[in-house]
From Swiss-Prot:
It catalyses: UTP + L-glutamine + ATP + H2O = CTP + L-glutamate + ADP + phosphate + 2 H(+); L-glutamine + H2O = L-glutamate + NH4(+); UTP + NH4(+) + ATP = CTP + ADP + phosphate + 2 H(+). InterPro entries: Class_I_gatase-like (IPR029062), CTP_synthase (IPR004468), CTP_synthase_N (IPR017456), GATASE (IPR017926), GATase1_CTP_Synthase (IPR033828), P-loop_NTPase (IPR027417). Keywords: ATP-binding, Glutamine amidotransferase, Ligase, Magnesium, Metal-binding, Nucleotide-binding, Pyrimidine biosynthesis. This is CTP synthase. Belongs to the CTP synthase family. Catalyzes the ATP-dependent amination of UTP to CTP with either L-glutamine or ammonia as the source of nitrogen. Regulates intracellular CTP levels through interactions with the four ribonucleotide triphosphates. It comes from Streptococcus sanguinis (strain SK36). GO terms for biological process: 'de novo' CTP biosynthetic process; pyrimidine nucleobase biosynthetic process. Pathway: Pyrimidine metabolism; CTP biosynthesis via de novo pathway; CTP from UDP: step 2/2. Homotetramer.
Length: 537
């Protein structure tokens, strides 16, 4: 069977939910027995989002092979339950840097290097390579931004050319747009969608399907109007209504036969999608009996997208405990030794997620101290683990000036220090310890119990600093347990205090491996402890 290519574009406004639509379609096609992969084209000039502020871009999602990517890849992985690779996120910066590098090496044999064909060929190669490296039947490619953006033009041209390259039967274009409701007029307006499709047609792409994002059901008359003006079949005008839970969306799209229309267009003769297990999960999510309150103490709490995988992993762990997770967003800058009890006292559990830089770290340290002293279940992640070690050094070991060398290079007690292979690194982008690495678990520890007593777990990392092993014996003598280490015993991966209900921190990012139907072990153990604390109140 020829590989099938589905391209998802957006119009009218950004942040319209293209990624969720693409991921939901991917889930439906996977449940039809197809092997699916998915990728995101981001038209910004950055090489990747690794050096971008979370306020600009949200979280950085890390793949198994160490690519720093768009947060939409997290949605893709959670919905479709696949592990993506570096070909799943492509930026303008990445493409141009590769083309320019080839030009400097003389690989274009003296040709004038241009957007067409060199940039578009490079983009098409990324699409085909993503499909080829995963041996996929179907690849879904989402283009970030909206039709009409200057930055998107080479990407859309590459998508247009794909139809001629691989054949019309192997390509489908899906366009997502906003269908606004004007309260004063009491009606929905189709003109923005019509103009968006007109713009797309002007670039040589005729959409085969429209997905309209709307707050209210559009009705068949609106669908017929859009079908007529945009030259798509009426049944191929699909509604994407606002929902209470994101995981309802694949079921809503299936009810409108979206996946069947796609299969018919691409001439895919495959069984209907069996969504029984997914439906049961959604039903459970919508009828959780318990509630648990988690304080998330972070640096970027004004923008929840900066912690989107953390939030989703907490929700998944809640599902496993029949509990709805309510998150209290606490600005780490506001936490002091004087007000910690006031800010954190109502929490059943506390999570200190990752981050970079000095701002907010003292507040996080006070948060960790409060959790340790008051025996509140706590999970520290990445920087959260590093600051857990700093807090213990200061307030248990009596090393008052202890710190991380990242935060204070002159500290006399560098509990956290630069990794040896990072000493001569000058560039910020793409130079961290990235991707999947193993952690050997200590038998009898809470970490081992969280992972069903496995000997080794593999999780994704994104860090430059590590625990300073010169202090390991001193910590262990005071009851601090290093419950996860690298197989060569050099790098600390997980720490815990066994006397507490649940006081565990890890260097890696467990949230990146969580799935709604398969929650991550440490997150599940943490939320379980928080639920137990809640029931004891």
């Amino acid at each position: 069977m020829s590989t099938k290519y589905i391209f998802v574009t957006g119009g009218v406004v950004s942040s319209i939910g293209k990624g969720i639509v693409a991921a939901s379609l991917g889930r439906l096609l996977k449940n039809r027995g197809l092997k699916v992969t998915i990728q995101k084209f981001d038209p910004y000039i950055n090489i990747d989002p690794g050096t971008m502020s979370p306020y600009q871009h949200g979280e950085v999602f890390v793949t198994d092979d160490g690519a720093e990517t768009d947060l939409d890849l997290g949605h893709y992985e959670r919905f479709i339950d696949i592990n993506l690779n570096k070909y799943s996120n492509v930026t303008t910066g990445k493409i141009y840097s590769e083309v320019l590098r080839k030009e400097r090496k003389g690989e274009y044999l003296g040709a004038t290097v241009q957007v067409i064909p060199h940039i578009t060929d490079a983009l098409k190669d990324k699409i085909k390579r993503a499909a080829r490296t995963t041996d996929s039947d179907v690849i879904i490619t989402e283009v970030g931004g909206t039709v009409g953006d200057i930055e998107s033009l080479p990407f859309l041209e590459a998508l247009r050319q794909m139809k001629a390259d691989v054949g019309a039967d192997n390509v489908m274009y899906i366009h997502t747009t906003l269908l606004p409701y004007l309260k004063a007029a009491g009606e929905m307006k189709t003109k923005p969608t019509q103009h968006s499709v007109k713009e797309l047609r002007g670039l040589g792409i005729q959409p085969n399907m429209l997905v309209i994002r709307t707050e209210k059901p559009a009705g068949q008359n609106i669908k017929n109007k859009l079908a007529q003006f945009c030259d798509v079949a009426p049944e191929a005008v699909i509604e994407s209504l606002d929902v209470e839970h994101l995981y309802q969306i694949p079921l809503d799209l299936q009810a409108q036969k979206m996946d069947q229309i796609v299969c018919d267009h691409l001439k895919l003769d495959v069984p209907a999608a069996d969504m029984t297990e997914w439906s049961a999960m959604v039903e459970k999510v919508m009828s959780l009996e318990k509630q648990v309150r988690i304080a998330l103490v972070g640096k970027y709490v004004e923008l929840p997208d900066a912690y989107i995988s953390v939030v989703e992993a907490l929700k998944h762990a809640g599902y496993a405990n029949d509990a709805e997770v309510k998150i209290d967003w606490i600005d780490a800058n506001q936490v002091t030794v004087e007000n910690a009890a006031e800010l954190l006292g109502s929490a059943d559990g506390i999570i200190v997620p990752g981050g970079f830089g000095q701002r907010g770290t003292e507040g996080k340290i006070q948060t960790i101290r409060y959790a340790r002293e008051q025996d509140v279940p706590m999970l520290g992640v990445c920087l959260g683990m590093q600051l857990t070690c700093v807090e213990f050094a200061r307030h248990v070991l009596g090393l008052a000036d202890a710190n991380s060398a990242e935060l204070n290079p002159d500290t006399p007690f560098p509990i956290i220090d630069l990794m040896r292979d990072q000493i001569d690194v000058e560039d910020l982008g793409g130079t961290l310890r990235l991707g999947l690495y193993p952690s050997k678990l200590k038998s009898g520890s809470k970490a081992a119990a969280a992972y069903d007593h496995q000997e080794v777990v593999q999780r994704r990392h994104r860090h430059r600093y590590e625990f300073n092993n010169a202090f390991r014996e001193q910590f262990e003598a005071a009851g601090f347990v290093f419950s996860g280490v690298s197989p060569d015993n050099r790098l600390v991966e997980i720490v815990e205090i066994p006397e507490n209900k649940f006081f565990v921190a890890c260097q890696y990012h467990p949230e990146l491996s969580s799935r709604p139907n398969r929650p991550e072990g440490l997150y599940t153990a943490f939320v379980t402890a928080a639920v137990e604390k809640s029931s004891d109140r």
